[in-house]
Amino acid sequence: MGDIIYIPKGKAREYSPYSLNIYNGCDHNCKYCYVKTMPYYKKVSNEEIKPKKNILEKLEKQLKKQEINEQVLLCFVGDPYCKTDTEYKLTRDILKILLRYDIPTAILSKGGERILRDLDLFKKFNKIKIGATLTLLDEEESLYYEPGAVLPRERIKVLGILHDEGIKTWVSFEPVIKPLTTYQLLELSYPFIDQYKVGKMNHYQLPYQIDWRDFGNTITKRLIELKKDFYIKKDLYKYMSLKLDDNYIDQDYLTLRKPRVKIIPEETKVLQPTLF
């Protein structure tokens, strides 16, 4: 059996040097979820989400023999504050172990107010950041694309509460379903968000085209204007005519460096055709 804390591969590596998945499956059932493209997904029932077997014991065993000083993300597969966690409360137990070993921790969740259950633990960490994926604002659209997730405005509200409590906050703008909505989400959230990670749509076929070059350039310029820490994922960056220095970000640490930006002429950058 593999370690509970593992090194993510491929595109996931842009989010964190380490990750930890608590449950098998996810009850959010998001239409765009990349996990649905994996063979693993076919073996998991979203109707019966179960904890990984003996996860607490295995985590303790791993941390006794392996020193981990870099960020661990909860979670890439599934949500640490899914509805199932209200029964098992395993995320809280996992956090207690990570806290004891002083491991830098990041959380990404669409669990809304369920996250606040562990606010007392968050405050004890030396390095922790709590984030949410924000894709839409309209409730009907959210229920269509993310039928099991907490509605976006509740996620935004909780991030504001966490910020007021002194917790570092972040947002994942990935996937991007409607660029105009993503711009709105940025304007709503930036007063209480410390950092953003921005991607595109990769695994779900939208019924319309998106100008990824325009979106990437526009949101990056606005993030710079707002003096926000951010990371533009490689899948989006390759479309952009806005050139960022290679070393403007340290993706393995909780504090992103300030971007240094310069514009390069359109004709000097070969843009990929849109995928849709």
Predicted regions and their residues:
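Auxiliary Fe-S-binding modules of radical SAM enzymes
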Residues: 1-11, 166, 176-276
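N-terminal [4Fe-4S]-dependent radical SAM core
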Residues: 1-71
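Conserved AdoMet/S-adenosylmethionine-binding subsite of the radical SAM
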Residues: 54-226
